[in-house]
């Protein structure tokens, strides 16, 4: 299955790159899945597996960074996503609200990681969030 958001974001990044812009595409939840050249960095922010576990099991909200890196590994996420994993939409409501709460939600350390990466590594002039589920990060992004 290919996500329309992945295709749109990857095409936008490629098009802006052809126009001479320096563009960094950060995958959210899962690695970018497209048929054409993948224009994203080889990291996943708010990794779907990690975010889900942080929501369901409080211990995962306090694990060290090396465990988070393992859970957010694109190869691991691809492997898990390739299995027939069904999550009921009715089970995702609390996680959706938590994500929108940003720094005050169960995924607060994911917000901190994204903000740190953008501030210290990415250093963008412009940030375009094409998925408003991470909109809870906006106050932290504006502050930093």
Name these PLM-found stretches.
Residues 1-7, 106-107:
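A short, glycine/small-residue-rich beta-strand->loop->alpha-helix junction that serves as a flexible
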Residues 25-113, 121:
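A conserved catalytic-core segment of Leloir-type glycosyltransferases
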Residues 5-16:
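Short amphipathic alpha-helix
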Residues 19-24:
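A generic structural motif
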Residues 1, 32-36, 135-138:
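Short catalytic/ligand-binding loop motif for oxyanion handling, primarily in non-cytosolic enzymes
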Residues 126-128, 141-144:
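Active-site proximal beta-strand in glycosyltransferases
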Residues 118-124:
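Glycine-rich phosphate-binding loop signature in dinucleotide/nucleotide-binding domains
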Residues 130-134:
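Short His-centered aromatic/hydrophobic patch
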């Amino acid at each position: 299955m290919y996500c329309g958001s992945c295709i749109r974001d990857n095409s936008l990044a490629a098009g802006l790159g052809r126009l001479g812009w320096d563009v960094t595409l950060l995958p959210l939840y899962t690695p970018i899945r497209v048929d054409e050249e993948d224009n994203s960095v080889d990291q996943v922010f708010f990794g779907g597996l990690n975010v889900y576990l942080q929501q369901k099991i409080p211990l995962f909200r306090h694990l060290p960074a090396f465990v988070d890196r393992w859970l957010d590994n694109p190869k691991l996420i691809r492997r898990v996503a390739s299995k027939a994993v069904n999550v009921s939409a009715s089970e995702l409501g609390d996680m959706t609200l938590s994500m929108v709460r940003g720094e005050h939600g169960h995924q607060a350390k994911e917000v901190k990681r994204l903000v740190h990466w953008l501030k210290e590594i990415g250093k963008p002039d412009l940030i375009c969030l094409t998925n408003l589920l991470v909109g809870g990060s906006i106050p932290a992004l504006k502050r930093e």
